[in-house]
Amino acid sequence: MKHKILFFIFFLILFCSLGQTPCSNGFAGEYPCNNYDLLSHIPVSTLANNSGNPEGSDIWGWTDPATGKEYAIAAMTNSTAFVDITDPINPIFLGRLDSNAGNNYWRDVKIYDNYAFIVADNVGNHGMQVFDLKKLRDITTPVTLSSDVIYDNVTLNANLIANDRVNDLAVII
């Protein structure tokens, strides 16, 4: 019986550590690191849609003030992905918001007052997508999301700056 318990504990520890890769000699597995361990990984092929040759371009985060859940918001060349990272060893891909105007080299995301503001460069009339992050609370399986607002009076945007202290959002062209 003692050996069965030790065997069970060994496999429980092994199972719980899957996906975790320590940073060693500047790498966590195949990924460069700087004294940060890799806790888990979701490939771009899961996060982005299949249009073009998707790559990652930016990442931001949001903590839901009502639930305390933490989310990663990953900008891809063709979409923006939303991942529940409350348990960083077991992240949950919630869904994606596709680009408003095709693929681009750079997409930027900033958070202000529970909203994600998303811009892109080199895609014509992308404008600025606005997404209510509180919608993430009710998602149980991955979905394709929609913008709540598309502000189309701006084009070819490379960056956003959000300043919570003065309630200001600046679009950098």
Language-model features and meaning:
Residues 19-173:
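Feature marking well-ordered beta-strand scaffolds used for ligand recognition
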Residues 1-22:
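Bacterial Sec-dependent N-terminal signal peptides
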